[in-house]
C-alpha cells in the first residue's frame, strides 16, 4: 500500500476495527497490516457470523474511529437500522470494497454513520488500486474512482490500445511496484 494513501500522523486516539476475516486481502491489507505498521490499535473479535447490532455496539463502546466494512456488512447494517436511528459513533473513516455500493447505501452511510464511505477497487494480486476517496479527491457517485496515489492505472481496449476517452470500458492495467504479482 502506498504511504501517501495513509496519513502518517494519525492521532494515537484512533483505533481500527473490521468484521472482515484477516485471511482475506480486505481484512489483512486494508486494515490489519497498515494499522500495525503505523502503531494504531486494532480491535479484534472473532464471531461466527456478522451481527449488525454487535457491530454498532462495538464501534460505539470502543470509540472506533476507522473501519473497513465489506458491502455485505453495510447492507446488513442498513437493513437492521431501518428506523434510521443514528448510533453514537465516532467514525472518522469508513472504507469498503469488493463490489459497488450504489448511491442508496452511500447516502445511508453518510446519514447514519455520519461519514462518507470510501470505496476501494482491487484484486487479491493488486489491492487498493482505485478508490473513490473523499479525503483526497472529489467523489463521484456510481464511479470506481481514481487511481490511489502511487499507482498508474490505465484502460486498454480489445485491440490492446490504451483508451484515452472517458466513459469507455476496457481492461484495467496497473503499473506499480506495489502489487503482489
Residues covered by each model-derived region:
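Conserved AMP-binding/adenylation subdomain of ANL enzymes
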Residues: 1-65, 80
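Conserved beta-loop-beta connector loops within the AMP-binding
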Residues: 154-175
